[in-house]
Amino acid sequence: MRILHVVPTYLPARRYGGPIVAVHGLCKALAARGHEVDVFTTNVDGDRTLDVPESKPVDVDGVRVTYFPSPFRRLYWSPAMRKALAVRIRTYDVVHIHAVYLWTGIAAARAARNARVRYVISPRGMLVHELIRRKSRMVKTLWLRLLERRGFDAAAAIHFTTVLEGQEAARIGLPLPSPFVVPNGIDLVPRPNIARDENTLVFLGRVTWKKGLDRVLEALPSLANVRFVIAGNDEESLTPKLRELAQKLGVADRVEFLGPVYGAAKYELLARATLFVLMSTSENFGNAVLEALMMETPVVLSQEVGLAAEVARAGAGVIGLEEVPALLHDRGRRTRMGRHGRALVESRFSWPRIAEEMERAYAAL
């Protein structure tokens, strides 16, 4: 199959977190299965521009990636991408569009309709009622009604990463033709042979309001001698407010902010953690959850995390901070959870398996 993925940003723009890594993992795994995979994206990297060739293909792990310049960065508008879509989109069997509220998705859907090419849309967690309500509600509502609706209506299918994400999207009122669920995957690596810390909670991810870091801080006063390590890019400048809250709660000496952590250092951090915590108010999937499970670290999740129910069923973690004290005092239970978590990742979330599932979904369009 010839497959085109259209995404507003791409590696090496790691500041955008899990969705970027997930899209690249999927593209790489599809290419490894023999498919011809192209990515159209922009060179936007926050307020900077990626140091990559413009408007010509670059090989990234076997995936042909074309980075187009974007004069209007906020919406990722790119005349060069529009021209390329008009010329080349009819050469693909399937177009896979990632993200909403951005020009790239609207342009790709329009070009695919004009060329009568089947396309799939992955909202990537952006169609969540609570997120729309809390941030730019009027703008997002009008955008969906006036600009996105036609694209969704004509899509061959809508892809979600979890059942929960699909349920949330259904509340928005957009047409969701032929919805299907294929989760994100992960590249399997062994757990490093290092000792695990005692009484240490770890969060890994983008530091944003929806991640529920305040929930964990507010629980710390009742968790004597427990440290909380926060690792991730602070794209909303929340760290000063979180430090202030920790000071107010009297736990500032037990909270550590590491900033972004990548590669081997990331896995060492997760492998040392006693527990991984993610108390998001909204989380369509949670790639860091898979990374923690792969390091045999039990996870503590809010019920709003898309993976929470599956993790709990597998015995690899718990839902709710109220479970933390009992877990901290039961090393045997944590060890069993760690083994269950690793087994879950290996059996369900390896990229070869996920690519095979997505391939079947494409073939069924």
Located regions from the model:
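Conserved donor-binding/catalytic core segment of Leloir-type glycosyltransferases
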Residues: L4, H159, I186, N193-K211, ...
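Aromatic "clamp/platform" in nucleotide-sugar-dependent glycosyltransferases that forms part
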Residues: T281
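Carbohydrate-associated surface elements
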Residues: N43, L164, G185
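Short hydrophobic beta-strand element within catalytic cores of glycosyltransferases
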Residues: P298-L301
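Membrane-proximal helix-turn-helix segments that form the acceptor-binding/catalytic region
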Residues: N114, K140-I158
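A short, well-ordered alpha-helix in the C-terminal region of glycosyltransferases
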Residues: R333-R348, I354-R360
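Glycosyltransferase donor-sugar binding loop
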Residues: D45-G46, L204, R227-R243, G259
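N-terminal subdomain of nucleotide-sugar transferases
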Residues: M1-P53, P57-D61, R90
